[in-house]
Amino acid sequence: MFMANLLLVILPALVAMAFLTLTERKVLGYMQFRKGPNIVGPYGMLQPFADAMKLFTKEPLLPTTSTSMLYLTAPALALSIALLLWTPLPMPXPLMNFNLGLLFILATSSLAVYSILWSGWASNSNYALIGALRAVAQTISYEVTLAIILLSVLLMSGSFNLQSLITTQEHSWLLFPSWPLAMMWFTSTLAETNRAPXDLTEGESELVSGFNIEYAXGSFALFFMGEYMNIIMMNALTTTIFLAASYNMMTPETYSINFMAKALLLTTLFLWIRAAYPRFRYDQLMHLLWKNFLPLTLALCMWYISMPTLTSSIPPQM
């Protein structure tokens, strides 16, 4: 039964990821006054499957100077971690109901750094190594703010369990009392998923695709799938943390539809930002985090810690 439930989570997530690639190309196409994919199938709907067929039927290449075991393990690890992150997510009922669901997501997402580092180092290419080093520094840095923002949210909901966040937001979204945190969280998720304007790790103009330059065929497709799964996952998590819908046990499908619509809107915002903004310089990216986001998130976290103590000391009014 668990395997059936696992497949019912993984397969729709993979289908969503496939159509996200098509949505991105369509959105970017229309924003640049062109059509985007429209040949394969009606309105280009079969384009993701054609891309997958092309990539997985190409000959897998292994560079002669590469460290083969790490080189082959890295793409599989990237996709596995992206899929593993879905297990504690309530949609409305999670696959596995952890008491420490948010901590699990934070710890597992930080493991994705290893796949990027291994791929950059094992490829034995200077471009790949520079891309990997940038990715590691960027991801680890932005995880600091993500963790502090999550801590602030936990202080408001009172539990590490993701289901309790839905209960907390029955009457009002957490977006309203903590909108500065939500804005910083969204910007940090852009950097965490290596998306524009924070896609320094695979800057085509200077690093020729970055850490995955030596990858081709199926292994490249696995990295690509892992990246897009992370985008959907991060937006689903943002929806759960800041925009959760009220859950009615009699009609669970209304929660799922609401959840999917919000995640889709946030994902479209990711694509819109990619079309609209140029890439940051690396020092600007780090300056934004360490000089701006970190002091702000720490100050807000201290505010949320001190507020209950402050209000409990006020005597009752007659």
Swiss-Prot record:
The keyword NAD applies. It holds the Pfam family NADHdh. The chain crosses the membrane at residues 2-22, 69-89, 98-118, 140-160, 171-191, 222-242, 253-273, 285-305. One of its GO terms (molecular function) is NADH dehydrogenase (ubiquinone) activity. It is an enzyme of class 7 (translocase). It comes from the Eukaryota. One of its GO terms (biological process) is mitochondrial electron transport, NADH to ubiquinone. Belongs to the complex I subunit 1 family. Keywords: Electron transport, Membrane, Mitochondrion, Mitochondrion inner membrane, NAD, Respiratory chain, Translocase, Transmembrane, Transmembrane helix, Transport, Ubiquinone. The gene is MT-ND1. Core subunit of the mitochondrial membrane respiratory chain NADH dehydrogenase (Complex I) which catalyzes electron transfer from NADH through the respiratory chain, using ubiquinone as an electron acceptor. Essential for the catalytic activity and assembly of complex I. HAMAP family: NDH1_NuoH (MF_01350). This is NADH-ubiquinone oxidoreductase chain 1. It is found in: Mitochondrion inner membrane. It catalyses: a ubiquinone + NADH + 5 H(+)(in) = a ubiquinol + NAD(+) + 4 H(+)(out). Its EC number is 7.1.1.2. Core subunit of respiratory chain NADH dehydrogenase (Complex I) which is composed of 45 different subunits. GO terms for cellular component: mitochondrial inner membrane. The keyword NAD applies. It is a multi-pass membrane protein. Signal peptide: none annotated. Coiled coil: none annotated. PROSITE patterns: COMPLEX1_ND1_1 (PS00667), COMPLEX1_ND1_2 (PS00668).
